Structure formats: structure tokens, C-alpha cells
């Protein structure tokens, strides 16, 4: 059983190495970021809004939002109104479908916007339960070597080491310091 319980900070590193498939397309999660309710960088920090309503629902549901009005971002709702942003996957299944959606094979799932485009995740999945189709999860094998560092693209709580990645993965959105 994949351990999806816990707050965002506990859940984010446990997702590294887990296989995520959406409609049969996906790969291994290699990069995540944690956002807790008491975190000024979290969308839930100032309370519920129509945009972040999924974060105030049940854990293990999707929180999907647009970043800068351009790209969808996919998060897993955690306990205590937090979420884990899935930043990057090592693409393994459905590479041709991913490349067609992305316009080519480069950086298929390296970064939240590229990942959602490759997996065809849109706002239509906001609030969707993650234990039902189109989502499919496979347990990780072994214990991954995880590196931590500061989160990317935020302006608050920038020094928190709440970004987690698979050490040495060529599929990260950005190298760790």
C-alpha cells in the first residue's frame, strides 16, 4: 500500500519513486514540493477560495490550478489542508502520446507545466479522487536516495528545504544546489 497519509511535508518525500499513470500514461515521480497550511507560500495559507477549494477537501484528491494563467499544476491534497506539487516524472509509459501532447520528446515531464501537458491533466480533474481512474499508482521499489533543497518559483518562505528529488535523476525540472 502506498502511504498517502500525513501532512504535505511527510508525504512529499514518500512520493519520490512512486509510479503515477494517468489514463495509462506516466512514469516515476522524481521531484515534489511540499506546501503546508501554515506556509506563507501555500495557496491554503489565507483560507478557502474557489481556486483552492480542493485543498480544503479530503486528502488524496487532486488540486489542479493554473500557474500564471498559462500552465496547469498538479498537486496531491495532503492532511491539514496542505498539498504536494508533483514537479517532475521520469517518463516511462506512453512516451509517444506524451511527445504528441508536448510537441516533441524534449523535457517531456520536467516541470509542473510540462508534466500536466504530457499527462493531459487539466482543471477538469481538480478535486478528483486519486484512487479512481484515470489515476493509477504503483508502489516504489526500494528506498530512493532523496535530495532536498529550496522550492522553485515562489516569493515567500523561499529558504524552506521543502523540495524533494531523486538524487542524480536526469528528469528533474532543475538541479539541486
PLM feature segments, named:
Residues 1-177:
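Conserved, well-structured core segments that form or line functional sites
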